[in-house]
Design a protein with these regions (language model features):
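Single conserved hydrophobic/aromatic residue that forms the stacking wall/gate
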Residues: 1-12, 187-193
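Mg2+-dependent prenyl diphosphate-binding active-site environment of isoprenoid biosynthetic enzymes
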Residues: 8-186
């Protein structure tokens, strides 16, 4: 039964992730993700938002059916934090002088939160001790931060064929990421010298 629940919860987590990516592509007006056309490019923004909303709604129905309130609470909170991260990112769109601290808050609320939840769900479903749950959540959060920083770096040094979008696309969309923040710090530091 645990194996069945783990499979179900991982499916739920994956659907939540897919829904957030659909919404993210609409917000960012993205047309390519990992070398493939986005849903909003293939269909339209309205369809993408509705399908993303449906996936989220269906995920919560599935969690209620599974009956694990700890998982339901965790993934509900995670979905809320991801949305808050999106709002924070929108508030700072195009803000070239954004602080590294703000950038880290954004990616913590989005990618890191999703990774943390994914690793913690496995611990919850295997009836792990709180110490183990916390350790896996910590690991997932740091893995998410690392993944997002690496992904943001690819925007400036990846091959277009492999990355699937134009180099610098995040910057042109007004997304200020760590490479730009560090470049600005380096430039202002050099200018001061």
């Amino acid at each position: 039964i645990v194996q069945s629940l783990v499979g179900s919860e991982m499916c739920i987590r994956d659907r939540i992730h897919s829904a957030t990516l659909m919404h993210d592509d609409v917000i960012d007006e993205g047309t390519v993700r990992r070398g493939k056309e986005t849903l909003n490019k293939v269909w339209d923004n309205h369809s993408s938002v509705l399908i993303g909303d449906y996936l989220l709604s269906r995920c919560f129905e599935m969690m209620v059916e599974d009956g694990n309130l700890e998982v339901l609470k965790l993934l509900s909170s995670t979905s809320s934090k991801i949305a808050q991260g999106e709002v924070l990112q929108l508030q700072h769109k195009g803000e070239v002088d954004m602080l590294e601290e703000t950038y880290l808050k954004i990616i913590s609320a989005k990618t890191a939160e999703l990774f943390a939840a994914a690793t913690k769900v496995g611990a919850i479903l295997s009836n792990a001790e709180n110490k183990e749950k916390d350790a896996l959540e910590f690991y997932g959060r740091n893995l998410g931060l690392t993944f997002q920083i690496a992904d943001d770096t690819l925007d400036y040094n990846a091959e277009v064929k492999l990355f699937g979008k134009k180099i610098g696309q995040d910057f042109f969309e007004g997304k200020i990421t760590l490479p730009i923040i560090l470049l600005c710090l380096l430039y202002t530091s050099d200018a001061a010298d």
